[in-house]
Regions:
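N-terminal "arm"/small-domain region of PLP-dependent enzymes with the aminotransferase-like
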Residues: 1-53, 144
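PLP-dependent aminotransferase-like
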Residues: 5, 92-150
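PLP-dependent aminotransferase class I/II
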Residues: 34-36, 205-290
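Short loop-beta-helix segment that forms the pyridoxal 5′-phosphate
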Residues: 67-89
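Short acidic capping loops at alpha-helix termini that bridge into adjacent secondary structure
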Residues: 73-77, 98, 184, 204-205
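Active-site phosphate-binding strand-loop segment of PLP-dependent enzymes
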Residues: 121, 127-188
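PLP-dependent enzyme catalytic core of the Aspartate aminotransferase-like
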Residues: 164, 317-318, 329-358
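Conserved PLP-binding catalytic core of the aspartate aminotransferase-like
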Residues: 271, 284-318
Length: 358
């Protein structure tokens, strides 16, 4: 079995369907509990109707459900075919003079800026400093009429943006007539009270962009949300193509956003499994676990294996796929990331790592 690496992890689609079913894909950060029961029921009940008709171009039922779930007015949101579409459209709309992005971080921050024809610069989050935000460097690089991306939590290190750092960057954005985009695609794994969406919907210099496919486990359906000032939400919505959120995605998310038991259980489960995985990795003599707070773990090789590619090769007989992180700006080939999956799958990973330790 051979799997090519893509810019977002392993590409399993080059395998046969039979081989795909054998892979334990720890390179993708999706809720291990799978579909929301309420969302699944909605899909089963409405799949034929939603397939045979055009979706609601205004996403009315979904916006109402998300408004109830997250406490954000419907007029302060725009919905897209995943968070990535909204990032690209925001950059097209705002067209800042310069974009600065964290390194390491989600590659689409830089790519969305390049697609909009904007110059891009990086500021570095250093592992030996706990991936702390370098506020002095940001202040120097954030020019007037620029844009800054921040992850909260950041991918791949899982670090949260502290309230004091958020306030400092927001103040800089205001002073320099610039714009702040916070990517909260993994925030649901942490909790509602740590989000900054309630602040930025009242500001004209910022937005929260959020993938709904990670926590609600529907990457194949594709859906994302932007939370921002109503005037800007309207402008962003006008840039989106009609019917960009399909009917099945709308039906599923409308129900899943109200599945309170699923939301609570997912957080508890992922946190418990993360702690067990971290403890097991700490017991290995060739892996250093970096602290984080979300449903994935960033690690560094410190012994037997020189690169994550080498580790991936020895894990292939176990049908295990990890995320090699050498293509993240600011990380080298000793870094890799693993998602928190089911208890059974996590145990398979732990046993495999133990087997290749010696």
């Amino acid at each position: 079995m051979s799997i090519k690496s893509s810019r977002h992890g392993g590409d399993v689609f080059g395998l046969s369907e039979e081989e795909q079913d054998k892979v334990f894909d720890f390179s993708i950060n999706i809720n291990p509990l799978g579909l929301s029961p309420k969302g699944r029921a909605a899909l089963l009940a409405h799949w034929e109707k939603e397939t045979l008709r055009y979706p609601d171009v205004e996403c009315r039922a979904l916006k109402k459900s998300l408004s109830i779930r997250y406490g954000i007015p419907e007029e302060s949101m725009a919905l897209g075919n995943g968070a990535t579409e909204l990032m690209y459209k925001l950059l097209e709309l705002l067209h800042p003079k310069k974009v600065i992005v964290p390194a390491p971080s989600f590659s689409e921050y830089r790519l969305s800026a390049e697609a909009a024809g904007c110059p891009v610069d990086s500021f570095f989050l250093k592992a030996d400093q706990g991936f702390a935000l370098p506020l002095e460097e940001i202040e120097k690089k954030l020019l007037r009429h620029s844009l800054i991306y921040l992850g909260h939590p950041n991918n791949p290190d899982g670090q949260m943006l502290s309230p004091s750092d958020f306030e400092a960057v927001l103040r800089l954005a205001k002073e320099k007539e610039s714009f702040l985009i916070i990517d909260e695609s993994f925030i649901d794994f942490v909790g509602d009270d740590v989000s900054y969406r309630h602040v930025l919907v009242n500001e004209t210099c910022g937005a929260v962009v959020m993938s709904l496919t990670k926590f609600y486990a529907v990457p194949g359906l594709r859906i994302g949300a932007a939370y921002l000032h109503p005037a800007l939400a309207e402008r962003l919505q006008d840039t989106l193509i009609p019917w960009n959120v399909n009917g099945l995605a709308q039906s599923y998310m409308t129900a899943a956003a109200q599945d309170i038991d699923y939301i609570r259980n997912s957080r508890v489960y992922c946190q418990a499994e993360r702690e067990k995985l971290s403890a097991a990795f700490d017991a290995l003599d060739f892996v250093k676990v970096l602290p984080g707070s979300v449903n994935f773990i960033l690690c560094r090789l410190i012994g037997r294996y020189q690169t994550a590619e080498e580790l991936q090769e020895v894990l292939m007989p176990y049908h295990i796929l990890i995320r090699q992180c050498g293509n993240y700006e600011g990380l080298d080939e000793t870094y890799f990331r693993v998602a928190v999956r089911t208890e059974e799958e996590n145990q398979i990973l732990i046993k495999a790592l133990g087997a290749v330790e010696n």
